[in-house]
Amino acid sequence: MLLVNWTEMDNPKLQNIPDEGTLKALSKTIGNCAFSLGVELDVDIAEIESTMYEFKKDMFGQNFDILRKWQTMSGGGKTIRTLMHALWIVDRRGFDFLKKTYKIV
């Protein structure tokens, strides 16, 4: 299993909040992982289930809705770093996409 050295990824860009355009593009990059991603991002289970019901046959819609719900939840921590950490666990393509998008070494 590959590991990420998060101390080496101490780039100031990681503290930024991802914009909606990036989240839309990301939602089309990642696979069928909306439920797992929502759990990793601490989205309420009822909200995740609501998304799964509302976007039954729309994987990209599920992904984007989970990302949007995460971004609009109260509290801090809606950073690129938090999102990358969750994506490292559930979908490496999304992790690689954010690394490339934000030019993080």
Model-identified regions with their sequence ranges:
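Alpha-helical death-domain superfamily interaction modules
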Residues: 15-17, 21-22, 35-105
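Disordered regulatory segments flanking catalytic cores
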Residues: 1-9
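Extended, non-catalytic structural segments that build the interaction scaffolds
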Residues: 9-30
